[in-house]
Amino acid sequence: MRTLFLNPPSFQGFDGGASSRWPASREIESYWYPVWLCYPAGMLPDSKVVDAPPHKISIEQTVEMARDFELLVLFTSTPGFEVDCRIAEMMKATNSKLKVCFVGPPVTVEPEKTLNASSAIDFIIRREFDYQIVDYANG
């Protein structure tokens, strides 16, 4: 499956703390790249990693990417969770065949709440997700 690994766009003016998911956009030009998304992407030919906040990729630009992929792996965070759900819904509306997987701390802490948050979320993976995503994408 052609897979998009997404650190989604942030909402305007949000300034958060450093982690492997940097959901903030700010004046600092030094960001951690999304390490945990890069590991499985390296095992899936023809996949793509998009780190939207530091590259100022808009929600609209991100949604358009849905047309080119079969699987979306979205690394969510607690501060951005609601916005991330809306982005997933918009991407699924653009490509109804897109499978959407959420990963990240909120998924691990509250898996049922995550699954029930949006009909766009097809499945979640708690904790470490790198090999599970690769297995899923490879069928």
Spans of features found by a protein language model:
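Short glycine-rich His-centered loop
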Residues: 1-31
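Glycine-rich beta-alpha loop elements in corrinoid/cobalamin-binding modules
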Residues: 36, 40-139
